[in-house]
Structures are given as C-alpha cells and as structure tokens.
Regions:
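Structured, acidic catalytic/metal-binding patches in enzyme active sites
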Residues: 29-233, 238
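A cross-kingdom marker for long, charged
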Residues: 232, 236-292
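A conditional alpha-helix N-cap/helix-loop micro-motif detector
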Residues: 20, 52, 144, 243-247
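Bacterial Sec-dependent N-terminal signal peptides
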Residues: 1-28
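Short, glycine/serine-rich, charged loops/turns that create anion-binding
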Residues: 12, 46, 270-271
C-alpha cells in the first residue's frame, strides 16, 4: 500500500498492456497530422534530486523554442477554495471512526514525535492527504524547487503562455474516489513502514527515471501484493482513475495547443507509457510521436 502513496506523491499522481515497443526516453517529439511545427512531451518527476535536472541534449532547446508550456495544473489558476473543501471527509467519518484505538495511538504518537504535529488537527482530513505528509517526510522531499516547478518558473520568466491540462477539482476528485477505509489503511501502513521501504523504492525509481526507462516505471506502478486485497483494490483505482482517465483528459486537452503552436508538455513520467498512455493516445489521433 505504501508504494502507491509514494507514486501518488512523486508522479501525482496502469495495468494496461505494455506491448512490444520499449518506452526508453523521457523526451518525445510530436509532429505530423498537419502540425506546422513540432511540439514536445517530457516526463517529469516531482523531485529536487540533482539527477532529474541533468537533461538530455535538446530538452532545453525545445523548451526555449516552445511558445506554450503545458503542465498538469497551471499554478496560476489553482483553486485553493476547491482544494481545501475537498480535503475534508464527510460528516460521518473521521480518523477516530476509521482507525482502531491502537492504530490511532500509533499514528498520533508518530505525528507528535516525528512531525511535531497534533493529529487532532487532521481528524477530518482525508487520510490519503495526511499520508502525503508522512511519505514526503520519509523521502525528504521539499516541494519548492521540484522539476515541474522549475519548468513552470522558467516558462514564466520567458513569458510563455502557460496552461493546465487538468483542473484542481479533477485531481482532488481522483483522490476522493479511493474509499476512506483504504485511505486509512494506507496512512497506518505509511507510519508503520516509515524509513523502511520508501528509501529503497525511491532509489530504484530514481534509477529507472534517470535511465528514461518508462517500462520499468510502469511496471513498478502496477505491482501490488496479491495477498492484500486492499493493495489490489488501490492498484486498480490508481490505474483507472489516476492514470488512464487523466491520460485521456490530458491528451485531448493538449491537442488544441499543439495545433496552435510549438508546445512543451511536461507531465508525470508515469502518464507517458502504455497502451493508454499519452504517447499512444496521441499516436491514435494521427500524430507521429518519437523518442528524442
């Protein structure tokens, strides 16, 4: 369960067939189908690690040339009111109703001792969002200068048109689709496994990311414990809602902009590969998408 929290945090973020082609690049060129000039697709990772900024030759040239910068959420138009309202569980649920007394004590002690926070402050918050605090702390990930933020700031400096391929409510609703009971289990697992699995998973994920090995990233995303029905259910929800549905939305919404002018699209790397990944969805629309 915890590894899915890691993926949500980093790719924020498929059980589809991978097929014969190897997705071995983070950087893809989109052309053909009447486009006047090429656009570009880049798989990001929400990380400050220096390695994610070691771009392949041509990435920054493509970024600098692009007239439009497209990301998952346009930071200029994030709806804070919608965000805050969606963080709250309905009136019949709270952490105390979802956790056993022992589980509540474990989580409460962890928040007090490791995070310096009182758990009652998060009593009505959806557990998955609370889990993000644990996962981010475990990975020592501070969100200020992560790769996606870096691209956004550079786009603003260059006065590019910046657009979001998703709406705040859509991303929040994806989280809300996970039953509270599964969210609560994920929170307890994250606390119990703090400092044990996260570092190993992150090292492996970073290795595949730096290699541009999207196939392996996709494989990590689809893994689940077959003996844990909750983990299997979480994996299916992650696949259907966090990836497939969002992939279709982003591919459709990107199309008017790549027709308008050269667009640099930067989205989580997990959204690129697979039969229903953005690469294949754009190809099905008639575009030529090749690794650069």
């Amino acid at each position: 369960m915890k590894k899915h929290l890691i993926y949500l945090t980093i790719f924020l973020l498929q059980l589809t067939a991978i097929g014969q082609e190897k997705y071995n690049s983070l950087f893809w060129e989109i052309s053909g189908n009447g486009l006047k000039e090429p656009s570009y697709l880049y798989g990001t990772m929400h990380s400050q690690d220096d390695r994610v900024f070691q771009f392949k030759k041509g990435v920054m040239n493509a970024f600098n040339h692009a007239e439009i910068y497209a990301m998952e959420l346009n930071m200029d138009s994030v709806d804070q009111v919608a965000l805050l309202s969606k963080l709250i569980m309905d009136s019949t649920h709270s952490l105390k109703t979802l956790l056993t007394e022992d589980e509540y004590t474990i989580v409460s002690d962890f928040f007090r001792d490791s995070l310096g926070q009182a758990l009652f402050m998060f009593e009505k918050m959806q557990p998955l969002f609370t889990s993000q605090m644990v996962t981010l702390r475990d990975l020592e990930a501070q969100q200020t200068d992560a790769l996606d933020i870096y691209f956004f700031k550079e786009a603003k400096k260059q006065k590019k048109q910046t657009i979001g391929l998703e709406k705040t409510k859509e991303q929040i609703d994806a989280f809300s689709a996970i039953p509270y009971t599964l969210q609560a289990k994920g929170l307890v697992d994250a606390v119990k496994n703090y400092g044990k699995e996260g570092e190993l998973d992150m090292d492996t994920m970073m290795k595949y990311y730096v290699e541009g090995n999207l196939d392996k990233l996709l494989e990590m995303t689809t893994e689940y414990d077959e003996e844990d029905k909750g983990d299997e259910e979480m994996a299916k929800i992650f696949n259907d809602i966090f990836l497939i549905k969002r992939n279709h939305n982003m591919a459709c919404r990107a199309e008017p902009f790549i027709k308008k002018g050269s667009t640099f699209i930067a989205v989580g790397a997990a959204h690129l590969p697979g039969e229903e990944g953005i690469i294949e969805l754009l190809r099905k629309k008639g575009y030529k998408v090749i690794a650069r």
